[in-house]
């Protein structure tokens, strides 16, 4: 019975998250991934540039669906006479109700916080400000959870630890979420062509890897052009020294690439998938490279002199 109840709870959480995705698809917003947690989940969408109305509908879809599930399980609980089914539905209607109410708290990154941000964004016409306020509320809520958890650890049998863990997690995610919006706001204003490096060293594709290592062991640069393809030495694993460089280099069609007029934020998002270097391509040819180091330096400079509120020293985050 316990396994069945746990399975149904997992399905409930999954359906909660899928409801977000369903609304996103209806709004023609691409959902890249769904990550589940024990108190809900996160639907990874392709863009943060959402209309407030779209974000609001996406946000409330999950809690509303959980409320519907809670109602269905409650009706089964009060009308079904089977002992096993009654026990399971009693457990499920309460947990779905808790899931819905918890996620309706107006603190980012919970669903209620996203809905709250959408309302603020519609009012202020400023996503960064809306996120800062919603994230601040999220941190306050997270702090309350941690406080209750610590209190519970001294007054109960230790169940308060879960509150501490959930509160700490929410506090961290609230901060990261605001950081991501600030990063996008900064780097969206910068064009790739102002940051890209054009002078990429060209190597002969017939050169053997062992010769490459001997000649360029002390060269700080890891990015090279080989027969029109890109060689990122930092990504090369253990290989036979007799392998030719043109066998290690990667063609444009297999790379994540950007154009010179694209934003630095697009390069920032791709840098994690490209070994820290994103090739800039025009008319089918590599004309430059944007490195993660250059992006981070520009970001650090902007953060130092632009005075963004509520943002502490930034560390690289998953994007």
Features from the language model and the residues they span:
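Small-residue-rich helix-interface/hinge motifs
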Residues: 1-55, 91-110, 114-119
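Divalent-metal coordination cores built from histidine and acidic residues
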Residues: 27-32, 49, 53-85, 94
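Alpha-helical transmembrane segments and adjacent TM-loop junctions that form the membrane-embedded core
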Residues: 90-183
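Cytosolic juxtamembrane regulatory segments of multi-pass membrane proteins
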Residues: 125-138, 192-214
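Membrane-interfacial segments at transmembrane helix termini in multi-pass membrane proteins
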Residues: 157-201, 205, 305, 310-317
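The conserved cystathionine-beta-synthase
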Residues: 201-220, 226, 239-242, 256-276, ...
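Helical hairpin unit composed of two closely spaced alpha helices linked by a short loop
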Residues: 229-235, 241-247, 251
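Short glycine-/small-residue motifs
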Residues: 233, 286-292
């Amino acid at each position: 019975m316990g396994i069945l109840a746990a399975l149904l709870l997992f399905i409930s959480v999954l359906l909660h998250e899928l409801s977000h995705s369903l609304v996103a698809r209806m709004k023609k917003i691409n959902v890249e991934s769904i990550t589940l947690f024990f108190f809900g989940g996160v639907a990874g969408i392709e863009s943060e540039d959402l209309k407030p109305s779209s974000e609001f509908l996406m946000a409330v879809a999950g809690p509303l669906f959980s409320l519907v599930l809670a109602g269905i399980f409650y009706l089964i609980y009060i009308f079904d006479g089977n002992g096993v089914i009654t026990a399971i539905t009693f457990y499920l209607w309460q947990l779905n109700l808790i899931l819905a109410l918890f996620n309706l708290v107006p603190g980012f990154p919970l669903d209620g916080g996203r809905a709250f941000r959408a309302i603020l964004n519609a009012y202020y016409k400023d996503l960064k400000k809306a996120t800062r306020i919603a994230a601040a509320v999220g941190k306050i809520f997270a702090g309350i959870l941690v406080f209750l958890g610590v209190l519970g650890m001294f007054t109960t049998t230790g169940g308060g630890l879960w509150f501490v863990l959930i509160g700490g997690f929410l506090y961290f995610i609230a901060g990261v979420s605001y950081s991501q919006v600030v990063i996008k706001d900064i780097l969206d204003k910068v064009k790739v062509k102002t940051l890209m490096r054009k002078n990429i060293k060209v190597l002969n594709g017939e050169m053997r890897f062992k010769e490459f290592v001997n000649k360029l062991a002390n060269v700080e640069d890891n990015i090279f052009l080989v027969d029109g393809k890109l060689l990122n030495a930092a990504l090369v694993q253990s290989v036979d020294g007799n392998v030719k460089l043109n066998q290690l280099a990667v063609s444009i069609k297999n790379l994540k690439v950007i154009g010179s007029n694209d934003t630095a934020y697009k390069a920032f998002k791709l840098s994690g998938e490209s070994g820290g270097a994103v090739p800039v391509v025009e008319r089918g040819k590599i004309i430059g490279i944007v490195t993660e180091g250059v992006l981070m330096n520009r970001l650090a400079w902007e953060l130092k002199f632009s005075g963004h509120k509520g943002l502490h020293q930034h560390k690289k985050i998953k994007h």
